[in-house]
């Protein structure tokens, strides 16, 4: 990236692109007091960069939910325990009793007819090493396909089925 393209200016923050294909750190945004202009600019940055990161935000659970609601109605993930006080927040923790399955390559809730815009992750405790979350820009991946491959796959439809992934968590055996 050239020195000129190091930061993209918005009115409420600066965006520092992280790679040519994906991601930007949004610097100077205060997520504890969002307003319509901040939501509009973050939404615009999200569409442009596909993944955005905010450092040094001191959001509590309620502020996290309020920020997320600024982008629309929140959905309750099927893996959320029924007795959780804030079902819109899915707690992901790893330790001796919880190994997790989200380290497998996935895209959140793609089985929905209209998947959500995205997920808003808030790291509370991170390990000294690891703890990485990986992202991919599928628009760039498609654009880089050959014309012959695009012609071959255009018009195809995929069926994403929740049953296999969540059958064990939901107390059911997956169907073959």
Task: Name the predicted role of every residue range.
Residues 1-176:
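Non-heme Fe(II) oxygenase catalytic core, chiefly the N-lobe of the double-stranded beta-helix
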């Amino acid at each position: 990236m050239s020195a000129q393209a190091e930061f993209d200016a918005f009115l409420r923050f600066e965006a520092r692109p992280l790679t040519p294909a994906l991601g930007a750190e949004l610097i100077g945004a205060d997520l504890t007091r969002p307003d319509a202009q901040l939501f509009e600019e973050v939404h615009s940055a999200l569409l442009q960069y596909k993944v955005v990161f905010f450092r040094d935000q001191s959001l509590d659970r309620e502020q996290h939910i309020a920020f997320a609601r600024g982008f629309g109605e929140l959905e309750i993930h099927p893996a959320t325990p029924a007795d959780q006080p804030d079902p819109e927040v899915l707690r992901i923790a790893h330790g001796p009793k919880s190994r997790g399955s989200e380290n497998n390559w996935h895209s959140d809730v793609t089985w929905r007819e209209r998947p959500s815009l995205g997920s808003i992750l808030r790291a509370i405790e991170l390990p000294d090493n690891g703890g990485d979350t990986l992202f991919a820009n599928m628009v760039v991946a498609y654009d880089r396909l050959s014309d012959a491959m695009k012609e071959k796959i255009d018009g195809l439809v995929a069926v994403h089925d929740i049953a296999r992934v969540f059958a064990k968590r939901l107390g059911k055996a997956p169907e073959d």
